[in-house]
Curated annotation (Swiss-Prot):
The chain crosses the membrane at residues 13-33. Residues 1-12 are cytoplasmic. Cell-to-cell movement function. It comes from the Viruses. It is a single-pass type II membrane protein. It is found in: Host endoplasmic reticulum membrane. It comes from Melon necrotic spot virus. The keyword Transmembrane applies. This is Double gene block protein 2. GO terms for biological process: transport of virus in host, cell to cell. Residues 34-61 are lumenal. InterPro entries: MNSV_P7B. One of its GO terms (cellular component) is host cell endoplasmic reticulum membrane.
Length: 61
């Protein structure tokens, strides 16, 4: 049981880090793109925020 609990803790961190990494990569790619980088960045930021909140709530509950 302790092992399972221990495994769950890093799992949540991994998910958050993965989302942050994906968002960073997406932002980097969009930044390289000359067309509508600001709009996409704003949309991506909002989407990531929603996903992060959803995962945070899911992991907590």
């Amino acid at each position: 049981m302790a092992c399972c609990r221990c495994d769950s803790s890093p799992g949540d961190y991994s998910g958050a880090l993965l989302i942050l990494f994906i968002s960073f990569v997406f932002f980097y790619i969009t930044s390289l793109s000359p067309q509508g980088n600001t709009y996409v960045h704003h949309f991506d930021s909002s989407s990531v925020k929603t996903q992060y909140v959803g995962i945070s709530t899911n992991g907590d509950g």
